[in-house]
């Protein structure tokens, strides 16, 4: 078993002026951390796009258990592909980093949703993600122009199309979206990736992945990066560490 010989703080500056830190100590740990809600953290990772620039994945791989990589945004146009998609996924596959995928949704119509699903499928051809393919719901134009029922229908089109092609699927959104727009029980059919940039989620629903901040710093990446915690089965047998959330 390969060990990570590291001790690093992934700092997340919060809007309140404080910071949360995910600490990954050098020693192997017997058990994962348990948060107040009882969830067990079994992996710390990042989500990245072209906005992180060129990533030194050989370095970054030593500090993460997984990655979630943007494939693109909106409808199936090559101009809307993420420019770092190919290199980022190739690096994860070369280094054995478990990864998931997300597509930033702009869908306003059923036709848009079908095109976004086609966009993801085109870019997934030949790729082997171990984690879900997520539809990213954060664009304000969706809430401004679509009813809750329409959003659900668009998400269903995307997710069912990807599932039919053999992929695990999920939905990304922040806590406000989950509690106001995405509160239909149908969403329980898909993996849930929750964004709350704070030391606690304040969310009573279930979720498999928590995006804790967008201001993390990690070796191998020059820009700020989103930090994510995952719950459930361990993703990398060679990464067995205790994860602790603290405030500073």
Language model features by range: what are they?
Residues 16-26:
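C-terminal region of N-terminal signal peptides and the immediate post-cleavage residues
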